[in-house]
């Protein structure tokens, strides 16, 4: 949830490239970034020419349509409000990249976690930068086993939860 800058999609594509795994990446974003902001991002510089091509392809992919970035990586970008969106299908991994509960409380309600749990496969993984108690409790309530992992610079911890 939250396509944002496309960083999670980009890193997933880079990491999966050459693995032989088929990735169907779906992202929901209410406010897509302006193309000028996307062009100013330096993410492609971290990965060479191939990475730059992938990054551009991710951002140039149409909205509301499944699009093959590579033979093994397809992307579906959905322009929608997660609070109104009813996902279909089942997901192995969910990057929950919303702003924290203090800034976007509507994204952290029990109903959102009920929806997440209903579309996550058994042993599916949910990750988020928020490590607040209410987030952990909602994940546990909806059938996840929660672990706290060391966070990136400036963030003490983040959550990795596995659906039981």
Language-model region placement:
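A short glycine-rich, Lys/Arg-flanked "PGG" loop and its adjoining helix->strand segment in the class I
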Residues: 106-123
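S-adenosyl-L-methionine
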Residues: 37-88
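Class I S-adenosyl-L-methionine
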Residues: 132-164
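Short beta->alpha hinge that forms the Motif I/post-I loop of the SAM-binding pocket
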Residues: 30, 108, 131
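Conserved beta-strand signature within the Rossmann-like core of class I S-adenosyl-L-methionine
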Residues: 93-95, 122-130
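SAM cofactor-binding core of SAM-dependent methyltransferases
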Residues: 1-59
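A short SAM/SAH-binding and catalytic strip from SAM-dependent methyltransferases
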Residues: 92-107
């Amino acid at each position: 949830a939250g396509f944002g800058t496309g960083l999670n999609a980009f890193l997933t594509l880079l990491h999966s490239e050459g693995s032989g795994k088929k990735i169907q990446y779906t992202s929901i974003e209410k406010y897509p970034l302006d193309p000028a902001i996307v062009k100013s991002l330096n993410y492609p510089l971290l990965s060479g020419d191939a990475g730059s091509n992938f990054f551009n392809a991710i951002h140039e992919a149409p909205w509301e349509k499944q699009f093959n970035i590579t033979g093994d990586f397809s992307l579906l970008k959905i322009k929608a409000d997660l609070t109104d969106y009813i996902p279909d299908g089942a997901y192995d991994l969910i990057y929950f990249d919303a702003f924290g509960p203090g800034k976007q409380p509507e994204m952290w309600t029990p109903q959102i976690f009920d929806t997440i749990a209903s579309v996550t496969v058994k042993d599916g993984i949910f990750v988020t930068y928020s490590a607040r108690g209410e987030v952990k409790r909602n994940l546990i309530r909806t059938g996840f086993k929660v672990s706290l992992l060391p966070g990136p610079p400036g963030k003490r911890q983040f959550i990795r939860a596995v659906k039981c």
